[in-house]
């Protein structure tokens, strides 16, 4: 199966601190890749390197079958949507008006606005000022902005932050529908084992900047049938990652 993202010996150091250490990642086309690890494991730093927001100390990144470089950064990023940090908006503007800023900058048709709002189930709140949005609604609007260009690859960092249990389930269903409906490949990072377990096809487990496991989630379940999935993660990471 075609690889959309491949990293080789990807490393990021800040002084003497190694946040990401010789990371080899493989994300296959049309799959949901769960990137799992405890807080501070290096997940966000890795995703920021994939988006060109942080420059690697060493290693290589291949995206869509070609080396990701400074020269092709802009053209590559046109095929990527992302929700990396809690989104912020102009509170005095409506959801549609905030998204209009993105379509103008990215030279996208305004018709995409109504379409993505419908996808994230905010179509009835499109004319509502974002200052009146809950944190969960703002996260969904952030997902809408990431979807505006209908990218080949979607990168989501802790997308269920700020959601109540029903909101978490709704966001999960939204993300799971994207590969089938729109042919997208999705990378989702989380520190919540239960969330990734219900969402991902393939999984990468990172701890202390190193990849501890990578492969099909179903294979991880088969690793040791006498152990719970939570215990397997504990063995791999040295940290409790259950809810």
Give each language-model segment a name:
Residues 168-181:
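Helical segment within the ABC ATPase nucleotide-binding domain
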């Amino acid at each position: 199966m075609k690889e959309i993202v491949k990293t080789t010996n990807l490393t990021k150091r800040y002084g003497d601190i190694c946040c990401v250490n010789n990371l080899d990642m493989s994300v296959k086309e049309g799959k949901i890749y769960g990137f799992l690890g405890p807080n501070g494991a290096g997940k966000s730093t890795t995703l920021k390197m994939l988006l060109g927001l942080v420059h690697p100390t060493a290693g290589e990144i291949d995206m869509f079958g070609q080396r990701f470089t400074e020269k092709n950064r802009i053209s590559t990023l046109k095929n990527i949507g992302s929700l990396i940090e809690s989104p912020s908006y102009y509170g005095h503007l409506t959801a549609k008006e905030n998204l209009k800023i993105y379509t103008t900058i990215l030279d996208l048709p305004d018709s995409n606005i109504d379409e993505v709002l419908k996808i994230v189930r905010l179509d009835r709140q499109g004319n509502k000022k974002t200052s009146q949005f809950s944190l969960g609604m703002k996260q969904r609007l952030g997902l809408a902005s990431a979807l505006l260009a209908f990218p080949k690859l979607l990168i989501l960092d802790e997308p269920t932050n700020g959601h109540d249990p029903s909101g978490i389930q709704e966001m999960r269903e939204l993300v799971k529908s994207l590969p089938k409906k729109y042919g997208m490949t999705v990378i989702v990072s989380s520190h919540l084992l239960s969330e990734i377990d219900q969402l991902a096809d393939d999984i990468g487990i990172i701890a202390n900047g190193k990849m501890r496991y990578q492969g099909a989630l179903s294979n991880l379940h088969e690793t040791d049938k006498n152990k719970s999935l939570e215990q397997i993660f504990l063995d791999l990471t040295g940290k409790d990652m259950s809810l």
